[in-house]
């Protein structure tokens, strides 16, 4: 039985004003247990394409966001290697291999955009 991995856009505030642009993610991605899914995060050459500072967060309802990937493809200690990150041009991707029930969550991407601003 398939379930949806719900995705929301991550809007961040930078240098005292709302960031001019936001990264684009699909509204939802679905998969069945054991399958692999890839979540895309499209930006511009000013953020995703210009820096290798893309991070991914997982958030379950009522819980704080958890860092899953940083610097495009690095995993913090304790994050299963089922989670992997990559980047091509202005698009970053999070791939979850061997989906498990606990992977159902919101996933957010974030990218450095220069001048201490994040999208």
UniProtKB/Swiss-Prot annotation:
Function: V region of the variable domain of immunoglobulin light chains that participates in the antigen recognition. Immunoglobulins, also known as antibodies, are membrane-bound or secreted glycoproteins produced by B lymphocytes. In the recognition phase of humoral immunity, the membrane-bound immunoglobulins serve as receptors which, upon binding of a specific antigen, trigger the clonal expansion and differentiation of B lymphocytes into immunoglobulins-secreting plasma cells.
Domain of life: Eukaryota
Positions of the UniProt region annotated as Complementarity-determining-2: 71-73
Region annotation (Complementarity-determining-3) ranges: 110-119
Alphabetical list of SUPFAM superfamilies matching this protein: Immunoglobulin
Record gene name: IGLV2-11
PANTHER family: IMMUNOGLOBULIN LIGHT CHAIN
Annotated region described as Framework-3, given as residue ranges: 74-109
Disulfide bonds: 41-109
Primary localization class, coarse: secreted
Framework-1, as annotated region: 20-44
Domain annotation Ig-like: ranges: 20-119
Pfam family, one: V-set
Gene3D superfamilies: Immunoglobulins
GO MF, any single term: antigen binding
Compartment list: Secreted; Cell membrane
Ranges where the record places region Framework-2: 54-70
Subunit structure as annotated in this protein's UniProt entry: Immunoglobulins are composed of two identical heavy chains and two identical light chains; disulfide-linked.
Biological processes per GO annotation: adaptive immune response; immune response
Native source species: Homo sapiens (Human)
Record keyword Cell membrane present: yes
Protein name, as recorded: Immunoglobulin lambda variable 2-11
Lineage, uppermost ranks: Eukaryota, Metazoa, Chordata, Craniata, Vertebrata
């Amino acid at each position: 039985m398939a379930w949806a991995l719900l995705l929301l856009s991550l809007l961040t505030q930078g240098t005292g004003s709302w960031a001019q642009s936001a990264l684009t993610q699909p509204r939802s991605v679905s998969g069945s247990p054991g399958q692999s899914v890839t979540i895309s995060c499209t930006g511009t050459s000013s953020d995703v394409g210009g820096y290798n500072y893309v991070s991914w967060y997982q958030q379950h309802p009522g819980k704080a966001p958890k860092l899953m990937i940083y610097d495009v493809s690095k995993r913090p200690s304790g994050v299963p290697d089922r989670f992997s990150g990559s980047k091509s041009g202005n698009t970053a991707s999070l791939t979850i291999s061997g989906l498990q029930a606990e992977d159902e969550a919101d996933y957010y991407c974030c990218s450095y955009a220069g001048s201490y601003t994040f999208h």
